[in-house]
Amino acid sequence: MILIAHRGNIDGPIKERENTLPYIEEAHDAGYDVEIDIRLKNNKLYLGHDKAQEEVQLSWLKKRTNWLWVHCKTPETFSFFYNSQELFIHYQLNYFLHDVDQLALTSKNYIWAYPGMQPLENSIAVLPELHNEDVSKCIGVCSDYLLKYV
């Protein structure tokens, strides 16, 4: 099963550390993929769920494409990634956009399932702990509490 640290969280949310470069690296160093929130502002990329928090360079993303799940927080951000053929074709960046959609399809064709949608075969269950969901049919889990699924 693919285990994805939601904003870098592994054993419960730590809001002040979420979507920060050191926290993301710590989650990966612990052996997990990481879901990050990215937004485009003034032609620069920033980490941050509700607002632009910390600038992130494309070079940083390019070195981590095999374990990052990039949640584009705005349509403009999604369009930026979609129109960057280098990021997708050469680096195979995995990105997606969703807000309250039941499902989203990532650029690598993974089904990203909104909380409350399980059991859904071969999907990524997002925050299944919110609804005590059955993840037995999932290929992955994106959670604040990954230790529960190890």
Task: State each model region's role.
Residues 1-150:
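Phosphate-group recognition and catalysis centered on beta-loop-alpha active-site segments
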